[in-house]
């Protein structure tokens, strides 16, 4: 990379203290941008908890900014996060669905509140360490911005970014989209970043590494109820429907019930298959390929299309969960805020509250919330 690059515009980089955002800041500095690193604090509660790493992450981000030689700032979006993301998270779980707060956080915080803050700082662009790409194509109506999958398909994060719009993509840079994670780690080591080997963050940001049920218990009342088979046999008691997601295998509390057995005499695994909120019943089935776990079609609501309008009916690929291989499907209808997908092969554990994201090859078209 050039050591004396031509000066480009001002870009504010969301720096989390992790290796991806750190290398992002360094790459943009090398490319000639005036870089400002910005650490976002999105959660206030439990800062003293053994599970919370916010303080260390802030120190890591500040240290990297100093080493790279960029301005560094701190902003607290905790109030916005609770209002726009966490409140919706609780509403969805209360309704028996399994939301994906990372999708909402990207749309409402990282590419809205953060973007607005960056523009107030005089930035022309924002950048993050997400693995995705932006491409601008000319159309008769003017330039259109497309969200593309990352070059490294094992790290592609376009699924979490599918609710971004044209205005947001026009201001966004994803420097890591053309790199593989191994290259990012190599760069971090070569330039002497102290966090080069730092473990990638996992799980929901405000929960951290703490047990999920323990966290949710603080905010939602638990209402135990029966666990039934499709035939109506009671095989256990659940702790509250909010604590279970479709396809869940561990933590059901029915391990002592044999039921259906394999040829070798061992019992087939149990899976959470359906929730009956009206009766407070959790239904479980045995066997990974039980019909109750398979869906040939789905309906989605709260649709968001990157182009600003729904794609035409036809054949596409779709993901109903992160890191899933695109499933061949047909978009049968897309009008208003709803759409329907029909799959060539039935999909496993399609979960209400999760996102169904549509792709045309490497181009992410948008998506909606599964109902």
Swiss-Prot record:
Residues 100-102 are annotated as: Interaction with target base in tRNA. Keywords: ATP-binding, Cytoplasm, Disulfide bond, Nucleotide-binding, RNA-binding, Transferase, tRNA processing, tRNA-binding. Gene3D superfamilies: Adenine nucleotide alpha hydrolases-like domains (2.30.30.280), HUPs (3.40.50.620), Translation factors (2.40.30.10). It catalyses: S-sulfanyl-L-cysteinyl-[protein] + uridine(34) in tRNA + AH2 + ATP = 2-thiouridine(34) in tRNA + L-cysteinyl-[protein] + A + AMP + diphosphate + H(+). One of its GO terms (molecular function) is tRNA-uridine 2-sulfurtransferase activity. CDD domains: MnmA_TRMU-like. Disulfide bonds join 105-205. It holds the Pfam family tRNA_Me_trans_M. InterPro entries: MnmA-like, MnmA-like_C, MnmA-like_central, MnmA-like_central_sf, Rossmann-like_a/b/a_fold. The keyword Cytoplasm applies. It is found in: Cytoplasm. GO terms for biological process: tRNA wobble position uridine thiolation. Its EC number is 2.8.1.13. Its main location: cytoplasm. The active site is at 105 (nucleophile), 205 (cysteine persulfide intermediate). ATP binds at residues 14-21, 40, 129. The record marks 130, 354 as: Interaction with tRNA. It is an enzyme of class 2 (transferase). GO terms for cellular component: cytoplasm. SUPFAM superfamilies: Adenine nucleotide alpha hydrolases-like (SSF52402). Belongs to the MnmA/TRMU family. This is tRNA-specific 2-thiouridylase MnmA.
